[in-house]
């Protein structure tokens, strides 16, 4: 937990500092030129997406709330946490074989994003499974615990770690032609994460019409 305390202290220092600023620009992820917005029938069709929302992390010792920006593809994940004023406090850039975390002016690297986050922060955040859960999908190792009156998944359990992760889909919304969660809660022991997706956009490579120059 010492890692967690140092990690959250660093982030809260950034948040407190941003409160002294009169102006703060909202720093978003760099553009990905080979991906364009698209419409899908269901979230599973989107091999890439980007979202804007909020993330809240709670433990018995600490609480953290921040804006969340995330661009996901099969080749890369780019995740940014910012304060309400738009000041960046954390960035994570990950591929299947490498991960780079920047927080409080320091850089950390590992071959695995999930292992890197746990080593630096003390949080065992399921970064590898979150892309499925964020889009309301059930993984091969997930067990459905409850469904709602419409047959939509309401709660799942993932037992890859002990204690297991329990994911509750609190509400849903239409985005990019699909139904995706609006709010979801993740719990594992005394660690709780809440996610709110204010905007979710499916992305894909733009199609080139016949006879049209690329």
From Swiss-Prot:
It is a lipid-anchor. A lipid is attached at residue 26 (S-diacylglycerol cysteine). Plays a critical role in the incorporation of lipoproteins in the outer membrane after they are released by the LolA protein. A lipid is attached at residue 26 (N-palmitoyl cysteine). It comes from Shewanella sp. (strain ANA-3). Monomer. It is found in: Cell outer membrane. Disulfide bonds: none annotated. This is Outer-membrane lipoprotein LolB. The keyword Chaperone applies. HAMAP family: LolB (MF_00233). GO terms for cellular component: cell outer membrane. Its main location: membrane.
